[in-house]
Amino acid sequence: MAPLISLQDVSKTYFNGDIAVEVLHHISLDIEAGEFVAIIGQSGSGKSTLMNILGCLDQPTSGSYFIEGENVSGFDSDELAALRRRTFGFIFQSYNLIPTASARENVEVPAVYAGVSARDRHDRAEALLQSLKLGERIDHRPNQLSGGQQQRVSIARALMNGGRVILADEPTGALDSQSGDEVMRLLRDMNENGHTVIVITHSREVAAQADRLIEISDGHIVADRSKKRRSNRDAAVGLAQRTREGFAAIADVSEAVKMALRALRANLFRTILTLLGIVIGVGSVVAMLAIGTGAQNSVLDRISSMGSDLLVVRPSMANFRGSAGGTNVTLVPADADAITELANVAFAVPEMTSTVTLRRGNIDYQTTANGTVPQFTEAKSWKIGRGEFINRNDMETYAPVAVLGETVVKTLFPEGSDPIGQYVLVNKIPFQVIGVMSGMGASAGGNDQDDVVLVPLTTGSMRLFGQRNIRTITVKVQDASAIDLTQERIQALLNERHRKDDTQITNMSSVREAFTETSNTMKFFLGSVAAISLLVGGIGVMNIMLVSVSERTREIGVRMATGARERDILVQFIVEALVVSAIGGAIGVVAGLSTGYAAKAFGMPVSFTPGPVALAFACAFLTGLLFGYLPARNASRLQPAVALSAD
């Protein structure tokens, strides 16, 4: 039968640029199952390199390595990880416990990567710690344990998956004599129970306790002496086979998240600073888009309230302001009557405006007077609140009647009395109040639409404005789909009537489209500014992950030594980045929503929609994935032997 371990003509060479350093020279060595072997040598003799090759932490430059007759020299990283997981248990001089994990969690690590269920892991880890007299220290972290206790935790970890072969690297080197003797007794007991034990040491006193002593010097085996042979392979094999192979549990998201949270809590302040970048980024996106969308919707609602089936006719700017040799204003009420006769025109509403002074009692108030016609409310989609609006009879009789806006009512009637039927002076002329308009609020330009007094067009022209020219004509069309054609007909009609092109027509549908396009551009700009904050947060995630990989290099080596595959390490660090981003994203969403509601409380228009919130959170998650991948990849590509030797 083939030996359990067999090295045939194995050499190991390290390269530093063009310089080659051969550490092991043509080593040939067989170790039978159940042996207790000590490999002794001084510092620099090559004993640690030999241990790394024996434990599949490193591969030989040349030669062959057989385990139970199978050549493992050409195994890839995943195959070597599986071999370490089911065959080897490691005990290190510096214990190499994960500082953020409890004693039980440290012991469970090999079983995590072997796919053992959580309950089975817990039970076996507790049983091993109990057997090593650490039952009261199960939930203690390494910094709460003595050196001897930490080494016993590492022994329990080595036995977690069965530990058919125990590789102990200077197991007593960091311990006092009493603790060292206890560790050697435990190694002897493990050998008695069928484990193959290989101790790497420079101490002849420690080596003397083994059944076989292999001495190495300058990369050569110079002595190989045996006191006796043991063969307890059946017990060792049986123990190792209890470990269930399968997918590595690190692939289980819940397990990966637990590991990530534990690691992030270890550097809480640094984690909070990193979270802050994500929170600011996501919060900015949510708040800015909510406020931007709210402002857009508010203005669009105001524009829509004017109707998308409206055309507004005004004098051209040159004629409106006056020009050399020209008249000031060219529109007259007859133009509105002519427009009404065109096809697809429902009605045309002429308006003239002027600033007037109102008086009631001892209250004087300056506002805008608007002379208009009965169709005004329909054209402006502005309902009468109380009383009645101007009618045709008022127009024909030049009636001195007025309809007030809410702002005017509050100013002239501060005591809250009913203004209907009462008289107010408009430029010292008495007008009877017949109605009050419903509140409209600010216009798209920010002007108070309720600060107005409405009078019949005929009355205003004759008694208030002293002119017959009108300021605007609002045209409502019957078929909005033909509004462009109607606009062309109106323009042609006015050009013919005035014998020149002295008017301009605004299509409210076009205004809405133009504003929508402009506001979308502004939203994109605001979103871009917020996205830059999110990008900065992503860079913070990458930074913390790169630092984390650097600080936890030895931990990565320990995980690989206990059976973690490259993709297990990759997944673990990506999950850590995603956890940071997800927590930051969630807090950022809450912060953004809170900011939006605070803005709303101060009267700002705010509109929350699920899309931007989900998008912001998804971007945070994607940021964690993108910026966490590079550090995670760097971690997964570390060589176990190199990672374990990191400071």
Swiss-Prot record:
| InterPro entries per record | AAA+_ATPase, ABC3_permease_C, ABC_transporter-like_ATP-bd, ABC_transporter-like_CS, MacB-like_ATP-bd, MacB_PCD, Macrolide_Exporter_MacB, P-loop_NTPase
Annotated EC: 7.6.2.-
Pfam families according to UniProt? ABC_tran (PF00005), FtsX (PF02687), MacB_PCD (PF12704)
Q: Where in the cell is it found?
A: Cell inner membrane
Tell me, which GO biological process terms does this entry list? response to antibiotic
Q: Which SUPFAM superfamilies match?
A: P-loop containing nucleoside triphosphate hydrolases
Q: Name any one GO molecular function.
A: ATP binding
Which domain of life does the UniProt lineage start with?
Answer: Bacteria
Q: Which residues bind ATP?
A: G41, Q42, S43, G44, S45, G46, K47, S48
Annotated SMART domains: AAA
Keyword set includes ATP-binding: yes
Q: Which GO terms describe its cellular component?
A: plasma membrane
Principal EC category: translocase
What is the similarity comment for this entry? Belongs to the ABC transporter superfamily. Macrolide exporter (TC 3.A.1.122) family.
Q: Which PANTHER family match?
A: MACROLIDE EXPORT ATP-BINDING_PERMEASE PROTEIN MACB, MEMBRANE COMPONENT OF TRANSPORTER-RELATED
Question: Assembly state and interactors?
Answer: Homodimer.
Which protein, by its recorded name, is this?
Macrolide export ATP-binding/permease protein MacB
Which organism is the protein's source? Rhizobium meliloti (strain 1021) (Ensifer meliloti)
